[in-house]
Amino acid sequence: MSERKQQIARHFGAAAPTYDRAARIQARIAVELANAIAAITQPAMILEFGCGTGNLTRALLGHFPDARLVATDLAPPMAAFCRKRVDAGARLLSAGMDGELPAFAMGKFDLVCGSLAAQWFSHPHQAFAALGALLRPGGVLALTTLGTDTFQEWRAAAALLGLSPAIPVYPSLAELDWQRPPGFLVERAEEQRLWDEHPNALDFLQSLRSIGADLPADHARPLSAGALRRILRQVDAQGHVRATYHVLTVLWRRR
């Protein structure tokens, strides 16, 4: 596992006990993805990547009472937390797994899915191809990820100060579709913007830390403490602190 992947796993593993208290937006997005999946397919075998504490896991098992689900996460503590939190008996298995290197037989699953996990992939195009290969013909690859306008308030505040925040560059919906594996049809592709309200900018940063998502972009230089304080003051000066989540949702069906 690369140093970057180890870093991601450590951050999310450490956040397992605090994740649910701060993950309001993430929980909503997971439920909406499960609803979208249930509208187009009835899977018997499901693989979930980036399961976290189990928001999508629980929603899927509620929709599909006869399905079996394998919940995986790059951070083994997250996968273990999911298994304990979601009471599904033998219907649910959990394991540590890098979603970019899936360790299952090809053609095994009816549904492969993940909510707000793909933005952590180093090579999403290759990852989607590898995950798609695990599907039977007619199976669905479904995911949500972050889009271009995510945390735009933070970017704007930094730009006013001549600073570059270490926020990843996220794709547009069209750019995400360019990463669709060959042989897959678009069942659904949409975007929405959700807003996470905070009393101040520091509370926003602390919420990211609580869910393990406070890592800078890969190869980006973190802001100095002084620069970070300047951005915090700039955001607070706007008088209304909110964080935009630009959410991309795609459901692709294998021919």
List the predicted regions and their residue ranges.
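N-terminal, positively charged/glycine-rich alpha-helical extensions of SAM-dependent methyltransferases
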Residues: 1-15
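Conserved Class I S-adenosyl-L-methionine
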Residues: 53-55, 186-255
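Conserved alpha-helix/loop element of class I SAM-dependent methyltransferases that forms part
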Residues: 24-43
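Conserved catalytic/acceptor-binding region of the Class I
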Residues: 140-200, 214-222
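A short acidic, Gly/Pro-enriched loop at the edge of an enzyme's catalytic core
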Residues: 100-112
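A short glycine-rich, Lys/Arg-flanked "PGG" loop and its adjoining helix->strand segment in the class I
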Residues: 125-137
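Class I SAM-dependent methyltransferase SAM/SAH-binding core
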Residues: 47-102
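A short SAM/SAH-binding and catalytic strip from SAM-dependent methyltransferases
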Residues: 111-123
